[in-house]
């Protein structure tokens, strides 16, 4: 079992011992081009680092956060972003969002990730020709919202800037573990040491004729999750401004 209170119903002590002998770390050491002394020294440094961090964490385990500190660790500080209305022109939601993505993807750290967002141009044609210009910044994925949301969360924690597209808002239910239990909580659980600045874009609601599993408005499910921010643009200008603001 996986619990610390495991009663060894599934495995005996003897079986556990046999598996410990197959420890992948030990097995991998045999393949390294290092002598035994170098490996021991490396192990010692890693163990010292882990012990130091472990003890440091336990020294703080009884500290009680104030309400202000709690808020600080749930949400990062948002920059003051000025939006200029110069150069206005007629547009649609599709074109406005594409403009925003085109400007965002000029950032070398930006990655657009999702199903059919590349050569296909997006399920609703939003990404369109962007793949021709930003193929290195666009990652097309298999049809598994849970999997590629996990990739996006991991990238965000590692410092990359991810814009994830969920084909239909209904499929946020499949991505909810990564969003609710990891992306939304990592800053708080690490006391501000880690963060996950990612953006998810998903079409919500009916009107596409694709049935009950593709036309729901599920944003209310996520409204009460600390660490998540939800925006719903009411016009093309706001759609572009909010997407860029969310990224920045």
Each predicted region: which residue ranges?
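Thiamine diphosphate
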Residues: 70-248
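Glycine/aspartate-rich loop-and-adjacent alpha/beta segment that forms the canonical ThDP
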Residues: 1-83
């Amino acid at each position: 079992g996986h619990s610390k209170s495991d009663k060894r119903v599934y495995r005996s002590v003897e079986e556990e011992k046999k598996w410990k002998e197959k420890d992948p770390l030990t097995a991998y050491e045999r393949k390294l081009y290092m002598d035994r002394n170098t490996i021991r020294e490396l192990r010692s440094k890693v163990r010292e680092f882990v012990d130091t961090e472990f003890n440091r964490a336990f020294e703080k385990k009884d500290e009680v956060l104030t309400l202000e500190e709690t808020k600080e660790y749930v949400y990062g500080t948002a920059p003051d972003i000025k939006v200029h209305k110069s150069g206005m022109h007629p547009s649609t939601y599709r074109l406005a969002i594409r403009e925003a993505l085109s400007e965002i993807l000029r950032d070398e750290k930006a990655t657009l990730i999702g199903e059919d967002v590349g050569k296909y141009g997006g399920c609703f044609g939003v990404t369109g020709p962007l793949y021709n210009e930003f193929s290195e910044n666009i990652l097309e994925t298999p049809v598994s919202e849970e999997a590629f949301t996990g990739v996006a969360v991991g990238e965000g924690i590692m410092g990359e800037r991810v814009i994830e597209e969920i084909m239909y808002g209904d499929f946020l239910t499949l991505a909810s573990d990564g969003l609710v239990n990891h992306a939304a909580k990592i800053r708080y659980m690490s006391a501000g040491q880690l963060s996950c600045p990612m953006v998810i874009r998903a079409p919500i609601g009916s009107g596409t004729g694709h049935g009950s599993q593709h036309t729901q408005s599920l944003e209310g499910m996520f409204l009460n999750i600390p660490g998540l921010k939800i925006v719903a643009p009411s016009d093309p200008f706001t759609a572009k401004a909010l997407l860029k603001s969310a990224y920045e």
